[in-house]
Amino acid sequence: MHRYRSHTCAALRKTDVGSNVRLSGWVHRVRDHGGILFIDLRDHYGITQIVADPDSPAFKVAETVRGEWVIRVDGEVKARADDAVNTNLPTGEVEIFATEIEVLSPAKELPLPVFGEPDYPEDIRLKYRFLDLRRETLHKNIMSRTKIIAAMRRRMTEIGFNEFSTPILTASSPEGARDFLVPSRIHPGKFYALPQAPQQYKQLLMVAGFDRYFQIAPCFRDEDPRADRLPGEFYQLDLEMSFVTQEEVWETMEPVMRGIFEEFAEGKPVTKVFRRIAYDDAIRTYGSDKPDLRNPIEMQAVTDHFAGSGFKVFANMIANDAKVEVWAIPAKTGGSRAFCDRMNSWAQSEGQPGLGYIFWRKEGDKLEGAGPIAKNIGEERTEAIRKQMGLEDGDACFFVAGLPSKFYKFAGDARTRAGEELNLVDRDRFELAWIIDFPFYEWDEDNKKIDFAHNPFSLPQGGMDALENMDPLEIKAYQYDLVCNGFEIASGSIRNQLPEVMVKAFEKVGLSQQDVEERFGGLYRAFQYGAPPHGGMAAGIDRVIMLLVGAKNLREISLFPMNQQALDLLMGAPSEVSPAQLRDLHVRLAPVQKS
C-alpha cells in the first residue's frame, strides 16, 4: 500500500464497503459521542468520516489529535446506518473504522479558524494566508480560478491563437502608471522595469509575422491602492491579431468571452449578443463608461423643459451658459416622498447641494406631479417630462444640471443608487456589452495640456487627416472596452502601425519624434520595416473570476495577495536589504523626507 494513501478523502463510496484503505489529511474536527471518537478527515478533494471506538488499536492516538493536525489513517470502510447518512458529502454513506492512526504533523493553536466564514481582520487572514486558503469557500475560489484560466487557454488555442511568453524584465515606458523599477548590477545607474502590460512586445510579434498571439500575462503597476485592483500585480488574457478591423476583433473574442461566462456562470443567464454602445452615448445614458446594464434606468436630457421655466436655479444656469444641460434620472416605483428625501440626503452626503425630484401620484382621476420642482415649472412642463421619460403613477424622476463633463459621474452614481435601492437590478445574470468610439485625447486639467485618453498606441479614427485638421478633443479612437455588470473586464484597440502617424499623435501631447524614438524605439523602428494592420485586447482575469465566483473583492480569488497598503504580510515584503546588496546594485538610499 502507498505510504500515505490509497484513496483521497472524496473517493470512497458504498461500493467500497469492506475494503481496507489508507487516507491522509487534516483533522477538520473531532467529536466525542459517548466515548466513540468521530474525526472528519479533510484533504484537497473532500471529507471522510473516521470512527475510533475504545476497542480500536487506533483509539489511544485518536484521543490526542486536535484540529488541523495532519494524520494518516488505516481502516476498514463500513456503511453508515440509514439515520447517520450525510447527504451533504459525496462520502456521506460510508465511514472508516480506524485500525491505525499516525500523526504526521501536529499543529499549534490556530490564530484563526479554517472552516465557515470567519469575520476576522483581513490583515490576520493575509498574514496566515496558508491557513485562510484551507477554508472551503476560498479553496473553491482558487480552484475555480485554475479552471477558468485553463478554459481561456483551451478556447484561444481552439481558434488558432499561439501562446507566447514575453519578457518580464524590460524597459520603462509611460503607460498610465508608475513602473516597478529593477536596478541593474551590470549596468550601474540603469534600470529595468517590470511590464505594465506586454503591449509593445505583442505588437512586435505581429510585425514579426506570428499573426495570432495570446498569453496569460502578469502585469505590474506601482499604483496607489484601489478597491477594484490588486496592489502590485494582476493577470490578463492578453491577445493580438494581424490584418483585422475592430469588428473582426469583436467577432473573434465575443464567442470566447461569452463561452467562458456560460461555462462557469452556474446557470445564470449570459448576454447572447453583446450590445455596442458608443462612449458618448454610455456617458449620457448611464453616466459611466462601464455601465451596469442590469439596471434598467436610462437617463435623458430634458434641458428644454427647464429653459425659461419657473425653476430659476436651472433656468438661470441654462440662460447663462449654452453648454449647460439638465439630465433626468427616471426611477420606476420610486414615487414616495420618503424615497425621494433619502436620495436627496444621499446626494448631500456626496458633497452635492441636493437632488431635485418630481414624483407622480393619482389625485382622483388625474395624474399629478409633486415636489418643489413640479410646483415651479408648472403642470404642462411636468407632464411633458413624464411623457418623455415614460413614467406613471408611483414613479419618480431626479434631476442634475450643469456642465455634463462635471456632473456625469455623480449622475451615474445616482442612477446606480436608485436602481439598487428600488431593487431594479437583476443580480442573477451577466450583462456584457462593448463600449466603443472612445475619445483619443483628453484635457489634463492638472497639467493644462492635451493627453492621451487611453492607450497611446491606438489608431485615431481618420488617421493623419484627423490629426492634422480636427480639434484633438473631437478625435475618436479605434478603442473599445468590454464591460460586465458595472466592471470593465477587457480593453483593446486597433493599433497605430504607421510611424509618421504615430509621431504626429505623440506630437499632440508634447512629445517630439526624438522622444518617441527614445521611449518606444523598438516599436518605432519595427514599424519602418513592414508592419501589418493589427489590433487586440486584454481581459482582466482577476475581475472576470471575481464576477463568476461572486467574490466580494479581488483578494478572495487570489492566492497570496498584498493588503490595501501594498504590504505582503505573509512574506514580509517590501523589506530592507543589506548594505552589501545595495553596493552591488550601485544604489545609495537617500534619507526619507518627513512631511
Curated annotation (Swiss-Prot):
Subcellular location: Cytoplasm
Gene3D superfamilies linked to this entry: Bira Bifunctional Protein, Domain 2, GAD-like domain, Nucleic acid-binding proteins
GO cellular component: cytoplasm
Amino-acid biosynthesis among keywords: no
Site label Important for tRNA non-discrimination, positions: 33
Keywords associated with the record: Aminoacyl-tRNA synthetase, ATP-binding, Cytoplasm, Ligase, Nucleotide-binding, Protein biosynthesis
Chain residues that bind ATP: 221-223, 488, 540-543
UniProt key word Cytoplasm: yes
Catalytic activity field: tRNA(Asx) + L-aspartate + ATP = L-aspartyl-tRNA(Asx) + AMP + diphosphate
Residue segments, region Aspartate: 199-202
PROSITE patterns: AA_TRNA_LIGASE_II
Molecular function GO labels: aspartate-tRNA ligase activity; aspartate-tRNA(Asn) ligase activity; ATP binding; nucleic acid binding
InterPro entries attached to this UniProt entry: Aa-tRNA-synt_II, aa-tRNA-synth_II, aa-tRNA-synth_II/BPL/LPL, Asp-tRNA-ligase_1, Asp-tRNA-ligase_1_N, Asp/Asn-tRNA-synth_IIb, AspRS_core, GAD-like_sf
One biological process term in Gene Ontology: aspartyl-tRNA aminoacylation
Chain positions recorded as L-aspartate binding sites: 175, 221, 454, 495
EC number: 6.1.1.23
CDD domains found in the cross-reference section: AspRS_core, EcAspRS_like_N
SUPFAM superfamilies: Class II aaRS and biotin synthetases, GAD domain-like, Nucleic acid-binding proteins
Main location: cytoplasm
Subunit structure comment from the entry: Homodimer.
Similarity comment: family membership: Belongs to the class-II aminoacyl-tRNA synthetase family. Type 1 subfamily.
Function (record text): Aspartyl-tRNA synthetase with relaxed tRNA specificity since it is able to aspartylate not only its cognate tRNA(Asp) but also tRNA(Asn). Reaction proceeds in two steps: L-aspartate is first activated by ATP to form Asp-AMP and then transferred to the acceptor end of tRNA(Asp/Asn).
Protein name, entry field: Aspartate--tRNA(Asp/Asn) ligase
Organism: Brucella abortus (strain 2308)
Gene symbol of the encoding locus: aspS
